[in-house]
């Protein structure tokens, strides 16, 4: 199974926390600046990761500056790679280099895992590796497993895993030691080849330097000869240096240069001699290594023979496993055969139970057939209720006609009331004219005659008295204050008279209305009582009809439930019958393989049982289903008709107290009574 995501990183972090460091190293952000990693490397190998190198790592003022983090991490990784190549002679070409930019910017856990993996390799391969290994062994088992897996991955990148690695567990001790020797020789050979390659590089460089020096010496000799031929030489500043003679300045300079070149030539020749000696030593080493390689080839041939033997043993082991698996399958088949026997017995018992249940269901169906009589009685009651509803609807039509007549009478009374109100308004206007006193005498006389005809005697006397007071006030020569007081008193009296006139008019109108409309009020009250009685009767009938409908629907629901139960039971019986037949067929096949005589006897018994089951199966009753569908359709039709009739009657009752135009504006009921009767 693959380890969870970043589990190895957290294990390496727990190991890194055990180190005694000055810099913080508890989480990914503290490790991203590279300071803690540099201190750990200095602690592991101070001879390689020196204090001078550690001082180059910027510990202060790093913060969130990813560029400084990047520079620190570059120094750390470069030093680690140099340590692996120079000190440990490990080649990390196959190991994926950690992405330092992602670590510096985002603190990526996967890249930090790779960097910590490299640091772990340095700790395990340093001089004090035993102490660090003991610290790792003190950790938890899960952490130890993850750390070992990290080391194995690092080792696998250093040297690719050989195909013999999977067989190493099944080899003998001799083969294991041979493999270890071959690995060690391979490592030595790689190291010597690397050293030979490096010495050859150095030798080529020295040869190039020697050729360059010889060329320069040849050039100098040519120039010296040329200068000796010329008598005068002009320097860089244009001054003649004179002939090259012993004791001159030019001669001394050239002599000094020649001595230097000779010394360099001697040094290069000494280096060449040293390289020759080293090359001879390496040739001898190569001869020894070739001898050892031949020995190892022989041991590898032995290892291949051992591998072949292991492959043969493995094939035999695989065959043994296949045989064991076949044996297990045969055992399971035998157990399945026993289980099938038990299931056949159980299915026989269940089939008997299902036959009994079918008989019970048939009896229940006969019982429910008796409920049909009750349903028919409910049908008759519903028809009677429909007839009563039709009679009540005809009565409601008659009452509506009477209501229209009463509305006509009410309109006539309303017109009379309007005429009386107009007369009252005329009287008010006459009173206002009297108050102002600005009309002519003729108009005053006509107004008084009209008021005398309409008003009672007490009001006439008051008006006469007020007119006399008015005349006296006009003829009098009192002050303005007295006139104002008299005018206020007159206004108050006029207002009192107005109120008295209002009360008198109201009494007159009420008396006239009572005298004219005694009989219509009684008729209206009687008509209202009749309407209320009819409404109560209608509500009672609707309640009775709803109760009957609910009873019929409940009975119908029970019938449908029983039908569904019957169909479900029949389906279950069919399913179990199919299973039973399959089990019987399997049992026959097994018994045929054991003894063919028993199989023929079983066929006969199974055929008899299947014939009995076919005879016991209930036959469908189409007539019962048709009757149930007819009754349900009739109930639905009756409910819809009843609802439409109630809606139409309610619409008629709602429109009885309104005018003809208001009734025409209202929405019609869903279906008329004629349509219901046609149904």
From Swiss-Prot:
Keyword ATP-binding: no
Recorded GO CC terms: centrosome; endosome; microtubule; synapse
Domain Calponin-homology (CH): 6-123
Gene Ontology BP annotations: cytoplasmic microtubule organization; cytoskeleton-dependent intracellular transport; determination of adult lifespan; endocytosis
Keywords: Coiled coil, Cytoplasm, Cytoskeleton, Developmental protein, Endocytosis, Endosome, Microtubule, Synapse
InterPro entries: CH_dom, CH_dom_sf, Hook_C, HOOK_N
Annotated compartments: Cytoplasm, Cytoskeleton; Endosome; Synapse
Stretches of the chain forming a coiled coil according to its record: 135-437, 480-574
MF annotations from Gene Ontology: dynein light intermediate chain binding; microtubule binding; small GTPase binding
Keyword set includes Cytoplasm: yes
Pfam families associated with the record: HOOK, HOOK_N
Subunit and partners: Homodimer. Interacts with microtubules via its N-terminus.
Comment on protein domains: The coiled coil domain mediates homodimerization.
Family the UniProt entry places it in: Belongs to the hook family.
Entry function: Involved in endocytic trafficking by stabilizing organelles of the endocytic pathway. Probably acts as a cytoskeletal linker protein required to tether endosome vesicles to the cytoskeleton. Involved in modulation of endocytosis at stages required for down-regulation of membrane proteins that control synapse size. Not involved in synaptic vesicle recycling. Required in R7 cells for boss endocytosis into multivesicular bodies (MVBs). Has a role in regulating adult longevity.
UniProt name for this protein: Protein hook
Provenance organism: Drosophila sechellia (Fruit fly)
